[in-house]
Amino acid sequence: HAGTYTSDVSSYLQDQAAKEFVSWLKTGRGRRD
């Protein structure tokens, strides 16, 4: 179960990081353009 929990947490963290990265791209690039 520990392995499953760890992989669930890392997929969650990767998902959050991806969403933050996408919104950073939208806001950051939008301001520059």
Swiss-Prot record:
A GO biological process this protein is involved in? response to starvation
Q: Which Gene3D superfamilies match?
A: 6.10.250.590
Disulfide bond annotation, renumbered to this chain:
none
Name its cellular compartments. Secreted
Q: Which GO terms describe its molecular function?
A: glucagon receptor binding; hormone activity
InterPro entries (alphabetical) = Glucagon, Glucagon_GIP_secretin_VIP
Q: What is the induction note for this entry?
A: Produced in the A cells of the islets of Langerhans in response to a drop in blood sugar concentration.
Described function: Promotes hydrolysis of glycogen and lipids, and raises the blood sugar level.
Q: What is this protein called?
A: Glucagon-2
Q: What is the lineage of its organism?
A: Eukaryota, Metazoa, Chordata, Craniata, Vertebrata
